[in-house]
Amino acid sequence: LNKILLYLMLYVPSIRPLTKYLPEQLLLIGVSLYLFGALVGIYLVTQRWYMISRFLNRMSIFVMLIVTLILVNLIMYPRADALKTELRGSDQDDNLIIVGEGILRGESAYHLKTYLGNPISPGPGWALISLPFVAFHIYALFTPASLLLGGLIIKQYSGEYAKANLFLLFWMSSLIFWEISVVGSDMVA
């Protein structure tokens, strides 16, 4: 059941970016290959965990994965965020940024709307968690920092890097993760 849920949560939603970015003539083969590859990956991890865990149980892999997350977000987030000048893209990041900036000014920002005209939706608790990223203008690091924290907690409780690295790799193998991460969505965080 866990494998099925993992597959449904991480890989089936990844059909969306494939349909958005692949040319129509490659769509069927692209989606099929991606979903098949995800199934094979889950199968290998569950059936060959001992072998895979020996390889993954390294701090250097953990650091490499986190650095990759940080670099991709630092490079891609400004590009995705710039789409708002054309009234395109996602305003999910703006929700937290607007509330955070309101908190920093000592004001409520819940009467404001995003550039797409959507009402502000995150609660004040969630806005407080993201406040350091808003205050220091490093919002692109919100998702990588959240995954870093999740990975460190897994490492602490499991006592090994293999499970923390697997946690990161599962997220990073999902196309929908990358799409929502680089637009500043807080869904993963």
Report the location of each language-model feature:
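Transmembrane-helix motifs of polytopic, lipid-linked glycan transferases
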Residues: 128, 139-163
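Hydrophobic, membrane-inserted alpha-helices
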Residues: 9-16, 123-131, 147-151, 171-176
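Aromatic- and kink-enriched transmembrane "portal" helix at the membrane-lumen/periplasm boundary
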Residues: 127-128, 167-189
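Transmembrane helix interruption/hinge and helix-loop junction motifs
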Residues: 134-139, 159-160, 183-185
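Hydrophobic core segments of transmembrane alpha-helices in multi-pass, intramembrane catalytic enzymes
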Residues: 31-38, 143, 147, 187-189
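Intramembrane catalytic core of multi-pass membrane enzymes that act on lipidic substrates
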Residues: 63-140
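Start-transfer (signal-anchor) and selected internal transmembrane alpha helices
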Residues: 1-77
